[in-house]
């Protein structure tokens, strides 16, 4: 993951490759059905949280910041000990952590299942094991960290539904695990796409995800 900070070294090559790469990422998004099992929309405004891991948290964070009903998204680490929740240590792949995002949302505006629809369809590829795109290691694994039994049931049922329908060419490898802790990442990781929209890594890997969200799920998309 550290190489992302030195991506500018390859700018000359990437300028040539960007158009092709972006097209490839855009084409990789998958249209999927709504979850058959989901929580009904709440009758009153409120605040709930979802913690999801889908590769580098920069792009996942940016996607959910553009989802209606979401009020805040923070990048962080989940799955390991709070004592090892530092970027350099997580990057070794030896801490048990996954780069994750904590999504704060209003359950009267969007359901947990609809958040998972965004997660599976445009935020990442749930069939890649311990990697996403150019990033490899267990810290880039696909995971859903549930905070209650309802979230667990919805996540497991949706994965089973999508696998049974063979929506993807390969089986979903997303882990469903109880949330032990969410450890917020360092300040420079927050709103990374907003602060570095022209960085080659962002242009190639993450901006196409926002376009996929806008085109494939227009009813859930919001401009910022």
What label would you give each PLM region?
Residues 2-7, 12-224:
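Flexible coil/turn and secondary-structure edge motifs
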């Amino acid at each position: 993951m550290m190489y992302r900070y030195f991506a500018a070294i390859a700018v000359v090559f990437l300028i040539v490759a960007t158009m092709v790469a972006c097209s490839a990422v855009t084409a990789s998004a998958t249209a999927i059905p709504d979850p058959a099992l989901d929580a009904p929309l709440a009758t009153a405004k409120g605040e709930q949280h979802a913690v999801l891991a889908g590769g580098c948290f920069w792009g996942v964070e940016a996607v959910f910041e553009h989802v209606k009903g979401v009020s805040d998204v923070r990048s962080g680490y989940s799955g390991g000990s709070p004592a090892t929740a530092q970027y350099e240590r997580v990057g070794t792949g030896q801490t048990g952590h996954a780069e994750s995002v904590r999504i704060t949302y209003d359950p009267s505006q969007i359901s947990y299942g609809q958040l998972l629809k965004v997660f599976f369809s445009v935020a990442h590829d749930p069939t890649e094991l311990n990697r996403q795109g150019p990033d490899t290691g267990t810290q880039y694994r696909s995971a859903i960290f549930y905070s209650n039994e309802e979230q667990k049931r919805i996540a497991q049922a949706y994965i089973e539904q999508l696998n049974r329908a063979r929506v993807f060419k390969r089986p979903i490898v997303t882990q469903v695990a109880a949330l032990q802790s969410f450890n917020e990442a360092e300040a420079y990781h927050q709103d990374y796409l907003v602060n570095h929209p022209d960085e080659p890594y962002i242009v190639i890997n993450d901006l196409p995800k926002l376009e996929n969200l806008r085109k494939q799920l227009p009813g859930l998309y919001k401009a910022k």
